[in-house]
């Protein structure tokens, strides 16, 4: 079962996780916990008069953060008693030292795997692309030192050389890469001359392209995320080489009952095409399989360039 309910409100509670499992999900990614959720602001109730000012200031500036995942750990412990599908925890931190501490607590709570939901917007003019990538590698290395469960990284699509970076992450110990993370995007309201943020929409074809280009070329699993609307989209991703397919927007729109429809659609397609398991057709249309028809990478590049020109000429 390749269908994973991705990190969202549907997976933030034991009841929500159980509903996903009952609906047929192969796994769930718990709603991400963010470091900012646990920042202590203002007065700590009934604490000021009993605590030393330095201790109180310590708590306000992050001292409690090391113990912040307590609620999500409790959710994991309770959910493990209710469902038998893998529970993938998701964390998003800003402070480098907190990634491994959060990860260790979540691992000890019984999570089956961990997804690092890394989001750093490169605003600094002095930060190079390699600096940006190195921050990811540092986080991964520190987390892997603390946990024994599989660790995946959910990547943004805006990486200069994704194949190279993907392999470096795999070499550093990433067990899987999730393509892609769809962040909030800015918009401008022209009448009020104000800015607002809108949720980024998953682009199925962008994920499909990079799944196909990376599958079986980098030494870790590849999973997709974003844009799934029907069972054909699931089949496409597996043909491209995806080991699992994350989705959530579809379930918001049509309900968790849509998971059964997706599974039935995939099974019907497999029956029609005489496949007995997803492994039988996984990656059949990946780049590495099609590359066999090319003499070298240069010839492959020429092929993709020719396809681009052929398609572009239709609109000329």
Regions found by a protein language model. Name each.
Residues 1-4, 59-62, 150-151:
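Short, basic, glycine/proline-bearing loop/turn elements
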Residues 8, 14-47, 70-88, 92-224, ...:
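Alpha/beta enzyme core
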Residues 10-11, 252:
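Short, glycine-/Ser/Thr-/acidic-enriched flexible segments
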Residues 44-62:
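Active-site gating loops and adjacent loop-to-helix segments of metal-dependent hydrolytic enzymes
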Residues 242, 249, 266-270:
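Short leucine-rich amphipathic alpha-helical surface patches
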Residues 246-250, 254:
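Helical hairpin unit composed of two closely spaced alpha helices linked by a short loop
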Residues 254-257, 261-273, 279-316:
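C-terminal extensions of enzymes
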């Amino acid at each position: 079962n390749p269908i994973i309910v991705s990190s969202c409100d549907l997976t933030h509670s034991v009841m929500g996780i159980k509903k996903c499992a009952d609906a047929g999900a192969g796994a769930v990614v718990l709603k991400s916990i963010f470091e900012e959720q646990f920042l202590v602001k203002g007065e700590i109730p009934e604490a000021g008069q009993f605590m030393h000012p330095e201790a109180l200031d310590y708590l306000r500036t992050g001292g409690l953060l090391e113990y912040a995942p307590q609620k999500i750990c409790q959710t994991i412990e309770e959910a493990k008693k209710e469902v038998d599908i893998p529970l993938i925890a998701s964390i998003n931190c800003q402070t480098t030292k907190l990634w491994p501490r959060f990860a260790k607590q979540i691992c000890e709570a019984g999570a089956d795997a961990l997804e690092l939901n890394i989001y750093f917007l490169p605003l600094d003019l002095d930060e190079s692309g390699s600096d940006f990538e190195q921050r990811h590698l540092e986080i991964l290395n520190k987390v892997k030192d603390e946990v024994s469960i599989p660790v995946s990284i959910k990547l943004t699509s805006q990486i200069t050389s994704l194949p190279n970076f993907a392999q470096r992450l795999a070499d550093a110990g990433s067990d899987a890469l999730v393509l892609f993370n769809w962040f909030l995007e800015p918009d401008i309201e022209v009448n009020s001359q104000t800015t607002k943020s809108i949720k980024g929409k998953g682009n199925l074809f962008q994920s499909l392209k990079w799944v196909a280009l990376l599958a079986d070329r980098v030494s870790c699993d590849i999973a997709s995320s974003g844009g799934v609307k029907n069972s054909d989209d699931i089949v496409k991703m597996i043909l491209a080489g995806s080991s699992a397919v994350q989705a959530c927007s579809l379930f918001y729109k049509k309900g968790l009952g849509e998971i059964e429809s997706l599974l039935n659609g995939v099974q019907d397609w497999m029956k029609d095409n005489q496949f007995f398991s997803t492994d039988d057709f996984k990656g059949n249309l990946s780049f590495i399989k099609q590359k066999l028809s090319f003499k070298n990478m240069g010839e492959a590049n020429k092929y993709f360039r020719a396809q681009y020109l052929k398609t572009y000429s239709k609109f000329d």
